[in-house]
Amino acid sequence: GVQKSDLFFRVGTIGFEQAALGKIAETSPGLKIVNCAAGITLSEGTHGGPRGYDPHIWVSVRNARQMARNMYDALVEEDPKDKNYFTERYNALDSELAQLDSTLTAILASCRGAAFVIKHPSLTYFARDYGLKQVALEVQGKEASPAQMRERLDAAGKAAPVVFFIEKGHDSAAVVNLAKSMNLPTVEISLLDYEWKDNLLAVARAVARQCADRAGRSE
């Protein structure tokens, strides 16, 4: 359990994680808590709270590289005798992530400025990385009022989105129907699945495919 651990890696600004940190520190006074979000420029205003930091930092390859670096540094500091092992594994991971970032950049090269709709603003950092525009239907990560929803839908219409992302296991039938009413193609994604790399590639390919289709129709 946590009591027997030397390090605790926190993702960053996830609500339930922050709520638990006080108790964890109290019951495990010798535990070192490592903030994996250190060095990442957090996006503000998409979620509730004083500054509304977006907690979904892992939905970004560039953020993931920084998170891996933070973990590597903490491990080397805690266990310097195994630095060579940690360095070898870290370098392999960083190389893989750099290649994935290059692949995503290439897939989305012709889509800069393209917009997509999603209920919960979970793709903020992904959109930032590749010059996309996320139109979230929630307000600061919470259900929108009828008036707010009208504003969101107006914003979506003006942004001319190419796809509506449905989050598997989270979005209701009403959200699916809303996407249909907007005459947008829908793509189901699951950003918490183990196959993280495949999910990010699926998001990129969906945007690229719809950008290409729209460009073809306009010719």
Language model: regions and residue ranges:
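Extracytoplasmic metal-acquisition and chelation regions
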Residues: 1-219
